[in-house]
Amino acid sequence: RTAAFNITGDFNLLGLDASFAAGVERREERGMDVPDPLQLAGLHGGNKVPLTVGEYSVNGYYGELLVPLVQDLPFAQEITFETAYRVDHYSTAGTVDATKFGISWVINDDVRFRGVLSESVRAPSISDLYSGQAQSYTSIGDPCAGVGGTNEANMNPVVVANCLSDPRIAATAAKGRFDVDQNITIPGFSYSQPQIQTISGFTGGNENLGEESADTTTLGLVWTPSYVEGLAVTLDYYEIEIEDVISSVSASRLINECYQSTNYPNASQCSAHTRFDSGHLRYWYSYGINQSRYETAGYDLAVGYTFEDLGPVPGELDIRGIVTMRDKHIYQTTSTSTPTDFVGEVGLNDEIARINFTWTTDDWLVSLQTNYYSDAQDDVTQAPGSYHLQAVDSYTYLDLQVRYDLTDSVDVYFGVDNLSDKQPPYCPNCKNEPNPGSHYTAESYARVWDSKFHYIGFRW
């Protein structure tokens, strides 16, 4: 449910026309995902699917201002400043705010510069906060394994002390474990294979999440030469840095940090596991926290031109192209982990280009789109000597669509995607390919098929 009040207007500032916008908003969001009884009970052929339900409310206020600074000066046909501020009070994440500062510098009818600096936030979603605990039967290592045994001297003494302060673990460690296969008693606290296999865990939401925050810089140049009518060229640079990105914290990390803490057992990480009466692990818990960092930068070059006169051929031809060149795409899981730049990996190719050729008349439209992906590596973290084993060549796909307008409100269309029937890359040694030795998944190259795809339809 949303209720909002907005106001806009113009005013005179030093003889120049400025404009403003302001408003308030009240928003209430509620979401739920209710699996059927079989899924809830885990009787549908898989693990239990949990119930997700949650809600939050937010009160927001914003203001925007657009102010021309100068007009009709040499090399400054117009310079305009814009700014915006917004503050939101979330019932979950608390108070967050966002700011924006921008400038537009029109040199003349042909050239314009633009730039924006902004700080923005993303509050956690209902899924982030309230997602139900889904069960997993993945085992994790127990940092207490080995205490009281022959290897205890090589263990972290803080971990040993914390583990033995649990009377359940201490009692089991003192007794040892009888190994039937070897017919011996293994000293200390250890696990048999069946005990390892009984460990299971749960992953879900975290109601204590905070907001993600982003700093964004964009700089752009627009060139629309008056002496070449119909031509438009834009070049934009972008840089985005996001802090406190919500990502899942592993159960192994949580339990290790618990027993390495000098605040055991009161450290918050210690609530992420439970044990049997014997001291052996029973359940682990994993959830999202604000821990990661993401940084990306690059360039977008767009060119468009319209041929309005095709001579004896009716209609007009519009050509639009955009090239994205990635400069960096860095992801850091935690503040103590090593950042990795993934530019050049499949899905984050150095260059991606799309060119559209569109011919139109009063009734017809024919569009041919080319999609280009530069060569890439399956895994940029691999050893350089293995690059040739996991290299994926550059790829180009062609898509065709034909549309005919039967009336002003009804049209029929026919299309062929992947016109040349080009198969996805084949990389038998790629470790990021979920089916080793097979074609790369469609998702990596924006495809949902492995061959030519035809479709037909109508709209009204």
Listing of model-derived features with the role each one plays in the protein:
Residues R1, G45-V53, A84-H89, G204-E207, ...:
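Extracellular loop and loop/strand-boundary signature of outer-membrane beta-barrel proteins
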Residues R1-T80, S292, Y331-T358, Q369:
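Outer-membrane beta-barrel transmembrane domain signature of Gram-negative proteins
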Residues D10-A18, V70-I79, D110, E152-N156, ...:
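Short loop/turn motifs that connect adjacent beta-strands in outer-membrane beta-barrel proteins
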Residues V24-M32, L69, Y85-S91, L117-A123, ...:
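Transmembrane beta-strands of outer-membrane beta-barrel pores
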Residues V49-A153, N162-S165, I199-V228, Y238-I240, ...:
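Structural signature of Gram-negative outer-membrane beta-barrels, strongest in the C-terminal barrel
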Residues E55-Y61, T95-T99, T203, S213-T217, ...:
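Residues that define the transmembrane beta-barrel architecture of outer-membrane proteins
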Residues A232-V380:
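Gram-negative outer-membrane beta-barrel transporters
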Residues D327, T370-T381, R403-W460:
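C-terminal beta-signal and adjacent terminal beta-strands/loops
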